[in-house]
Curated annotation (Swiss-Prot):
The gene is accD. Keywords: ATP-binding, Cytoplasm, Fatty acid biosynthesis, Fatty acid metabolism, Lipid biosynthesis, Lipid metabolism, Metal-binding, Nucleotide-binding, Transferase, Zinc, Zinc-finger. Component of the acetyl coenzyme A carboxylase (ACC) complex. Biotin carboxylase (BC) catalyzes the carboxylation of biotin on its carrier protein (BCCP) and then the CO(2) group is transferred by the transcarboxylase to acetyl-CoA to form malonyl-CoA. Belongs to the AccD/PCCB family. One of its GO terms (molecular function) is zinc ion binding. Residues 29-285 form the CoA carboxyltransferase N-terminal domain. Binds 1 zinc ion per subunit. This is Acetyl-coenzyme A carboxylase carboxyl transferase subunit beta.
Amino acid sequence: MFKDFFNRSKKKKYLTVQDSKQNDVPAGIMTKCPKCKKIMYTKELNENLNVCFNCDHHIALTAYKRIEAISDEGSFIEFDRGMTSANPLDFPGYEEKIEKDQQKTGLNEALVSGTAKLDGIQYGVAVMDARFRMGSMGSVVGEKICRIIDYCTEHRLPFILFSASGGARMQEGIISLMQMGKTSVSLKRHSDAGLLYISYITNPTTGGVSASFASVGDINLSEPKALIGFAGRRVIEQTINEKLPDDFQTAEFLLEHGQLDKVIHRKDMRETLSNILKIHQEVSN
């Protein structure tokens, strides 16, 4: 009996202690700037249009937040919300990836389109959302863009398109690449009707999107420090065997070389677009 008592006393005993410093902050209440790493209240950041208070970095806006920022309250009417991608090439795992992004973002595809009013002026709008398959352009994205452009042409409306994309969607192969020409044809009809197309290029816009509808606006605008280009920086450097400038493929570089009309801080986005639409309306009338 005594022997058992002493044997028991030699066994290690553990006690679970509750962490007094347990994180009680609800998920989503704070946001970290991806550039300077400053942590900010999400609510205050949203009120500042997702622009970092510390370094002025323009953090991505969701498609609906972007539309809300540039339209009169309650004026947005969404088109083709239910359209979703098929898997024409039977690409392995594609349906699962689409489903995952749908659950994560609440979107059916990488673009939201429709009509809205800004200071009473009606216009067509399409906004790419890079959270969904990196904003890549597949058959649904191309079709939705063409439908809203054709609607604007028929109803003689100006059109604004916000690009944010990694390019053509590889899982759809040539069908994805076809959207470059398809959207350009719709834009040509819109242009031939004497209507205004504003291309607003945001970070990042690359690949087939930068080489098609994003670059052919009557007015091409962008946000500070936005990454805009076709091929990646490393690919270009290896191809030409030269070191590229530090600001290569930024909005400021493109502005300096005549490929953009203006780089606009997000706080000035609404006012700038409103002024352009008002001028266009006066000239059209």
